[in-house]
UniProtKB/Swiss-Prot annotation:
Pathway: Purine metabolism; AMP biosynthesis via de novo pathway; AMP from IMP: step 1/2. It holds the Pfam family Adenylsucc_synt. One of its GO terms (molecular function) is magnesium ion binding. This is Adenylosuccinate synthetase. It comes from the Bacteria. PROSITE patterns: ADENYLOSUCCIN_SYN_1, ADENYLOSUCCIN_SYN_2. Plays an important role in the de novo pathway of purine nucleotide biosynthesis. Catalyzes the first committed step in the biosynthesis of AMP from IMP. It comes from Buchnera aphidicola subsp. Schizaphis graminum (strain Sg). GO terms for biological process: 'de novo' AMP biosynthetic process; IMP metabolic process. Keywords: Cytoplasm, GTP-binding, Ligase, Magnesium, Metal-binding, Nucleotide-binding, Purine biosynthesis. It catalyses: IMP + L-aspartate + GTP = N(6)-(1,2-dicarboxyethyl)-AMP + GDP + phosphate + 2 H(+). Substrate binds at S300, T301, T302, G303, R304, K305, R306. The lineage of its organism: Bacteria, Pseudomonadati, Pseudomonadota, Gammaproteobacteria, Enterobacterales. Mg(2+) binds at D14, G41.
């Protein structure tokens, strides 16, 4: 039995973390977002109704759960308020159950303006950011000039700090990028409006979590993006601006490593990626079209079509090691139901030297091609199955092979978008 569970992505994001957090949250006391911003979209389907969350922890759809947005997250206060109101329209009232770290940096309009201006200037060499200001907000944090959530509590200090930062960014926007300046007065006015709505949520969230651990409360740490987008361990420079690996939890919450507990990596039964960057198993054929359509592979934040490919076992092993994973959860198994054969990449071959890579060559991904195993498809419906014994034999063989390649057990299998479409192979909180 585990007190705390970490849930993080093993690929390039979009693995289905939100559903699994939602599935496990009914038996937890806290759900914690520890990095990223509103560039991540977690899609939940409850009783057939779809809800997309970008900042608010997924577990808050349960009335007994307390949500924490910790210091590692960069927060747009305007997007946060929009999300709170969206949930209220869906009869989820969370104002007294959501706490926001006073140390979390704010994302403000000048971050978005500079993000878009940089991408425009880079042209075909653009990174492909979501344009939400995430990277510039993290830059401000590291440069020690960020406005933080706690600054909203003191209007005089807020206005003084804001003026300095707006002047700094307007100089770049006007002089270098030839863009229109951002209005200091408009930002301040808008901040003062939202301040009152979230004022009582602003807390020392590290202290809340330390007390929860002392009281042996159950905590879920909810990751955003995926391991291969980690700023240090991902496919740089086509990465996010935070640590999406296990290490990001420690710095992003103030919770020490011995209290993390069980670390669950989420992986699709195939692979997807949004935006630019290397993708060894990427497909450009009818299978790509099939996966996109059957898997509804369009970004919940940007609406962009996701690139699709076969499951990459080399990258998966890398994620297992980087994160010290306890186990895996396989999602979207049902998407593969109609395929006659299914491939798994087990190694890479360098197109120049012909060298075979069994481990993830982080610096050489542009120069490799996948080496595949071919497995028979099951050609039977698996969607909605809730017991492992009801899966087709070929599907079970596919799952067993993934376990062998990853060298960790698969404890959860998702067979559809609803929280009930889940096979639990090991007791976690239950």
């Amino acid at each position: 039995m585990n007190t705390n569970i970490v849930i993080l992505g093993t690929q390039w994001g979009d693995e289905g973390k939100g559903k699994i957090v939602d599935f496990l949250s009914s038996n937890s006391s806290y759900v914690v977002r520890y990095h990223g911003g509103h560039n991540a979209g977690h899609t939940l389907v409850v009783n057939g109704k779809k809800i997309i969350l970008h900042l608010i922890p997924s577990g808050l759809l349960y009335p007994n759960v307390i949500g924490i947005i910790s210091n590692g997250v960069v927060i747009s206060p305007f997007e946060l308020v929009k999300e709170i109101r969206m949930l209220e329209k869906n009869n989820h009232f969370i104002n007294e159950r959501l706490f926001i770290s006073e140390s979390a940096p704010l994302i403000l309009p000048y971050h978005i303006a500079i993000d878009l201006a940089r991408e425009k200037q880079l042209g075909i060499n653009a990174i492909g950011t979501t344009g939400r200001g995430i990277g510039p907000a993290y830059e401000d944090k590291v440069a020690r000039r960020a406005l933080r959530v706690g600054d909203l509590k003191n209007t005089q200090k807020l206005s003084t700090k804001l003026k300095v930062i707006v002047d700094y960014y307007n100089h770049q926007l006007v002089s270098f990028y030839k863009q229109n300046p951002i209005s200091y007065k408009e930002i301040l006015k808008d901040l003062l409006k939202v301040k009152d709505l979230i004022y009582n949520m602003i807390k020392d969230t590290s202290a809340i979590l330390h007390k929860a651990i002392e009281d042996k409360k159950r905590i879920i740490f909810e990751g955003a993006q995926g391991t291969l987008l980690d700023i240090d361990h991902g496919t740089y420079p086509y990465v996010t601006s935070s640590n999406s690996t296990t290490g990001g939890i420690i710095t992003g919450t103030g919770v020490g490593p011995k209290n993390l507990g069980y670390i669950l990596g989420i992986t699709k039964a195939y692979t997807t990626r949004v935006g630019k960057g290397p993708f060894p198993t990427e497909l450009f054929d009818d299978i790509d079209s099939y996966l996109s359509k059957k898997g509804q592979e369009f970004g919940s934040t940007t609406g962009r079509k996701r690139r699709t490919g076969w499951l990459d076992g080399v990258a998966l092993r890398y994620s297992v090691k980087i994160n010290s994973l306890s186990a895996l959860c396989i999602t979207k198994l049902d998407v593969l139901d109609d395929l006659k054969e299914i491939k798994i990449c087990t190694s890479y071959k360098d197109v120049n030297t012909k060298k075979i890579y069994k481990d993830f060559p982080i610096f050489n991904l542009e120069d490799v091609t996948p080496v595949y195993e071919v497995h028979p498809g099951w050609m039977k419906k698996t969607s909605g199955i809730k017991k492992i014994e009801d899966l087709p034999k070929a599907a079970c063989n596919y799952i067993n092979r993934i376990e062998e390649i990853a060298q960790v057990p698969i404890d959860i299998i998702s067979t559809g978008p609803d929280r009930s479409d889940t096979i639990l192979l090991k007791s976690l909180f239950f």
